[in-house]
């Protein structure tokens, strides 16, 4: 029998407590007990990786790659310098979960990174924090100082042979630096542009050394897994989607915000947690994982569950868990214009298909909104999107194509109306 899924604060467990970001608060809820246990009992990296594999934890930044498998690529036995990086560079519209983990529970990120460093043999770590959030960067620096003072960072941690230094790195606000190799280039002081792969960061990362990059929420999940066991984490979710996930719900809801829930919860219940659709309006469509995941119509979304397989079944994906709610007053043409402008502005310009294609997409949609569109523009948008997708070094080209293709697929009638009449078919959007 299925167990009802519910809110479960795991990465955000200190939120709501007094002085949540302090090390004293974290220690009061059992913080740093996982790394203490590892160092005291000298648990092998292989044992820990196996536990993470059992947990079913998948990368929480968007790709959803199995964490245990990714960590196994960087062997603890390899000698020399290695790096571990927390990717807190969330810059896609609708994403704001990592900011709250840093704000309320920075020490759980630190402990997760320490465990990762122990497993993979890394001696230096960075938390790459998005350039447009300043207070959280300062807060994380304070947390590092607290951890050092308590003997959790530096040399011979907790009297063991384990050495690990951690640094906060403030990014420059570029969305592209959320891509792991562009992030590495930025840390090295270069222009943030993706690298060709292979070689992958696990063999050639920061300064040519083996490097592991994982999302903030991924690292913050690790201490709980070590303390409670991989099977317990897996059981929180559903098969192929173990654990909890923070969903950032925004758009036309009464109570927008971050909601950490057990994976497998019906979307309808998540929407209820967010207060339902605002102003008594009807739900029209949802972007379930951020703009780089396909749009889903209301009737399909209301029967879906919030997990990897549940969203895949309705033609979308979990992504970073950025749930954008659109009510029946939303003009899909104008919404797509905003999203296409974002991808156009954030293209790093390295790859011709993305550099030129995102500009084409935005300009064509803009002329439709300006009342100058032609029916042929719909075929042009599809054609350009398909020519951008799969032809770039990183996935930004694919991401830019996704909303275009899914918006037109589900709401082509709105685009045709806009082209024929030079205005939106949604009442009030032309005022």
Language-model regions, residue ranges each:
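Hydrophobic alpha-helical positions that pack around
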Residues: 137-263, 275
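Histidine-anchored nucleotide/phosphate-binding helix
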Residues: 105-119
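Ferredoxin-type iron-sulfur electron-transfer modules in oxidoreductases and energy-metabolism complexes
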Residues: 34-52, 80-84, 88, 97-102, ...
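Conserved phosphate/anionic-ligand binding catalytic regions in large, soluble enzymes, centered on
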Residues: 52-74, 171-185, 189-191, 344-356, ...
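Gly-rich Lys/Arg/Thr-decorated short loops/hinges at beta-loop-alpha junctions or inter-strand turns
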Residues: 26-33, 86-98, 201-207, 248-253
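Short amphipathic, charge-patterned alpha-helical segments
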Residues: 112-116, 262-280
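Cofactor-/ligand-binding subdomain signature composed of acidic, glycine-rich
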Residues: 1-51
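Short acidic, glycine/serine/threonine-rich loops at helix termini
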Residues: 63, 68-71, 95-98, 137-142, ...
